[in-house]
A protein has these predicted regions:
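Perimembrane loop-to-helix junctions flanking transmembrane segments
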Residues: 47-63
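Hydrophobic alpha-helical transmembrane segments of multi-pass membrane transport/permease proteins
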Residues: 14-50, 67-85, 126-129, 189-195, ...
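Aromatic- and glycine-rich beta-strand/loop motifs that create alpha-glucan
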Residues: 1-32, 97-98, 112, 295-297
Length: 300
């Protein structure tokens, strides 16, 4: 275990030593929240107000708080996954600059080497996304704050789950890559496409029924819905306190993807947590098997 921790710390130091990569990773959440607030806030606001009956009046503060909570939840859902591909660059860099050849002739097992990469990816991703979460809380405080301490802690738990999910996924995808250009290309594809697939840029409820059924099989759908449920929990609590019709509140929950459906059944929050834990376990096993089955790497 001491060897694994030493490798993890070595990878983390390399991440902090690369000022360009560190700056890019740290500035990404700031850029995302500005872009989301600029281009997606109106889309989210229109989607929310469309579910409100004409005879119901909702204060601008509650509307702004709802839109801000949906926006920040979407940002965190994307950031927790895409950032892992950026901070996982060390694994590819070691192959590109020949450092892995030194590791391969050392007495350290391949499993420990790759576990060190994985743990450093998790640690660095949590740091970057922790900054993103602080920025999101500041934005929520400005636009409309309805969260309590329990809601904040649940979102932190969601963030850890999503970072673990993203780290296992990025480790599997990055494993066969040998150049920084390849990882940059993969990172670009993931950054551009993941937000649409997970329902962050546009609620999945706005998609066609066929596409909704396809996306219901992807864990990313439930990852986004999970963090939305906890980010928006205070908003729905405020709506219930003001005695808004239950049908309207449920319609809003459906519109914002807080009630994902799988084969006609609504997936509960506890089930979403189970899906994420199961997905992390499955991808972790796949990553372990990929390491075991890689042929000849240690002899090259």
């Amino acid at each position: 275990m001491r060897t694994v921790l030493a490798l993890m710390n070595r990878n983390r130091k390399l991440f902090f030593k690369d000022k360009g990569m560190l700056f890019t990773s740290m500035i990404t959440p700031v850029i995302l929240i500005v872009l989301y607030a600029t281009f997606l806030a109106k889309v989210f606001r229109d989607s929310f107000t469309a579910a409100i009956p004409d005879m119901i009046t909702i204060s601008d503060e509650l509307i702004n708080g709802t839109v801000a909570a949906q926006l920040t939840a979407s940002l965190m859902a994307v950031s927790c996954i895409t950032v892992t591909f950026c901070v996982n660059l060390t694994m590819v860099q070691d192959k590109a600059n020949g450092t892995r050849k030194d590791f391969n002739v050392s007495p350290v097992s391949r499993g420990k080497i790759y576990l060190g990469y994985f743990l450093s990816t998790v640690a660095n991703s949590l740091m970057v996304n922790g900054l993103a979460f602080v920025l999101c809380l500041g934005y929520l405080f400005k636009m409309g704050w309805y969260m309590n301490t329990a809601d904040v802690l649940w979102v932190l738990f969601d963030m850890i789950l999503l970072v673990l999910f993203g780290s296992t996924l990025s480790s599997i995808i990055s494993f066969p890559l040998t150049t920084q250009g390849q990882l940059s290309a993969v990172g670009t594809i993931v950054s551009a496409g993941y937000g649409f697939i997970c329902g962050a840029y546009m609620p999945i409820s706005n998609f066609g029924s066929g596409l909704q059924k396809v996306l219901s099989y992807l864990p990313s759908t439930y990852a986004t819905s999970l963090i939305k449920n906890h980010m928006l929990h205070g908003v729905f609590r405020e709506m219930e306190r003001k005695h808004y019709p239950g049908e309207m509140v449920e319609a809003i929950r459906d519109t914002l993807d807080c009630n994902p459906v799988f084969h006609g059944n609504v997936v509960s929050v506890n089930q979403m947590i189970g899906i994420m834990i199961g997905s992390i376990a499955v991808f972790g096993i796949i990553y372990y098997l990929v390491i075991l089955l890689s042929k000849g790497e240690g002899r090259r």
